Amino acid sequence: MSSKVGGGKGGKSKTSSEAKVLTTRSSKAGLQFPVGRIHRFLRNKNANNVRIGAKAAVYVASIMEYLTAEVLELAGNAAKDLRVKRITPRHLQLAIRGDEELDLLIRATIAGGGVLPHIHKSLVAKNAPLKKPKALDA
């Protein structure tokens, strides 16, 4: 029995050395995010049966990958500053709220993220005179 790859009806059979190597659209675009899956989601989730071009999925995947890398880099820096090895929702919150552009883009509430530390200026004493303990005269 010959080693036949691909199966199918009729036509020439290809041996394993002649088998066509499949390349994904993600690898063609040099991305890690799944271009095919994003294209499928774009097609299935649109309301008015609008046609979705092939490049649209590549653009969306590249934007998502860039934003994810940006947020993870900032969150990793926040975790490193706090000397921990695991990124938590708190680190994500600090990273997103610390970056002006990401803060404008991501207005969502992050569960377990806490709040940013901030004390209003009027509540902070400027140069309050230190009270010296009165000497006990005996």
From Swiss-Prot:
Gene3D superfamilies linked to this entry: Histone, subunit A
CDD domains membership: HFD_H2A
Locations listed in the record: Nucleus; Chromosome
N6-acetyllysine modification, residue list: K4, K9
Family indicated by similarity: Belongs to the histone H2A family.
GO biological process: CENP-A eviction from euchromatin; heterochromatin formation; nuclear-transcribed mRNA catabolic process, non-stop decay; regulation of transcription by RNA polymerase II; silent mating-type cassette heterochromatin formation; transcription elongation by RNA polymerase II
Function: Variant histone H2A which can replace H2A in some nucleosomes. Nucleosomes wrap and compact DNA into chromatin, limiting DNA accessibility to the cellular machineries which require DNA as a template. Histones thereby play a central role in transcription regulation, DNA repair, DNA replication and chromosomal stability. DNA accessibility is regulated via a complex set of post-translational modifications of histones, also called histone code, and nucleosome remodeling.
Listed name of the protein: Histone H2A.Z
Subunit structure: The nucleosome is a histone octamer containing two molecules each of H2A, H2B, H3 and H4 assembled in one H3-H4 heterotetramer and two H2A-H2B heterodimers. The octamer wraps approximately 147 bp of DNA. H2A or its variant H2A.Z forms a heterodimer with H2B. H2A.Z associates with the VPS72/SWC2 subunit of the SWR1 chromatin remodeling complex. Also interacts with RBP1/DNA-directed RNA polymerase II largest subunit.
Entry PTM: Acetylated once deposited into chromatin.
Keywords assigned by UniProt, alphabetized: Acetylation, Activator, Chromatin regulator, Chromosome, DNA-binding, Nucleosome core, Nucleus, Transcription, Transcription regulation
